[in-house]
Regions:
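Hydrophobic alpha-helical transmembrane segments of membrane proteins
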Residues: 1-114, 124-243
Length: 243
């Protein structure tokens, strides 16, 4: 597992560095100045590695910050017919359900996965577990935690519920991923979250309507109910970890 982790992250970083160098060569003004063998220039590789590292850190937090400040907290302050803490948790709950099946982190085909599992013949199970574990721990739990606490407390949400949020997001994603794997074993139909079916889009529309439409008329889930659902989501994630 450790060897798979080292190779997979090295491969991902190499792919990202090469993508950065390729992008530099597509800039008209730089294209003529940069050497043809750009990928072999040590200095440019160091620079690209630094940029890749900075981008990895930013990707952990920047997207979450924008998510909370716009789609959850930013929109939430527009509603005046319900308590702000209830509105915050209500919107977050339904958006998390949408994200659980639209962005599982496990059924998203990417080029680095193709290189690793198809071209390099790496163990698909180990490779997937390494990257999925990284996504759950860092991109969700660590990435969500500071903003869940900050924006939640601004909306007067109790701290203990704020602390549940990242684990609820992670747990629900794990539960949906486990169900999708079970469904694949039963029906043999592989899921590609980049190509969702009509039913998935209809359900997404209904959930968005529930997230943003209901608070407009003063209808939101009470905080206790939302907190209970958060706990159920966490327990579902723990149970699905066996999958």
């Amino acid at each position: 597992m450790n060897r798979t982790m080292r190779i997979s992250f090295s491969l991902k970083n190499t792919y990202r560095v090469n993508s950065i160098l390729y992008s530099l060569k597509q800039i008209p003004l730089l294209k003529k100045l940069l050497p043809q063998a750009l990928y072999q220039v040590w200095g440019f590789k160091i620079l690209a590695n630094i940029v890749a590292g900075i981008w990895e850190v930013l990707s952990l937090f920047l997207g979450k910050f924008l998510y909370f400040i716009t789609m959850v907290g930013g929109v939430g302050i527009l509603y005046k017919k319900a308590a702000q803490d209830d509105v915050f948790l209500h919107i977050l709950l339904f958006l998390t359900i949408i994200g659980a099946f639209m962005n599982t982190y496990i059924f998203n085909p990417t080029r680095d996965k193709y290189y690793a599992m198809i071209l390099m013949r790496m163990d698909a199970r180990e490779y997937t577990l390494v990257h999925y574990g990284y996504a759950i721990l860092f991109k969700i739990v660590i990435g969500f935690l500071p903003f869940a606490i900050y924006f939640g407390r601004v909306r007067k949400v109790p701290l203990w519920i704020c602390l549940l949020i990242p684990f609820f997001v992670a747990g629900l994603k794990m539960a949906v991923a486990a169900y999708t794997l079970w469904d694949y074993e039963k029906r043999g139909v592989a899921t590609n979250e980049n190509k969702l079916g009509k039913l998935a889009w209809v359900v997404t529309g209904l959930l968005l309507a529930a997230a943003y439409g209901l608070p407009a008329v003063g209808v939101v889930l009470p905080m206790k109910a939302t907190a209970a659902l958060f706990i159920l989501g966490i327990l579902a994630g723990i149970a699905s970890a066996r999958k």
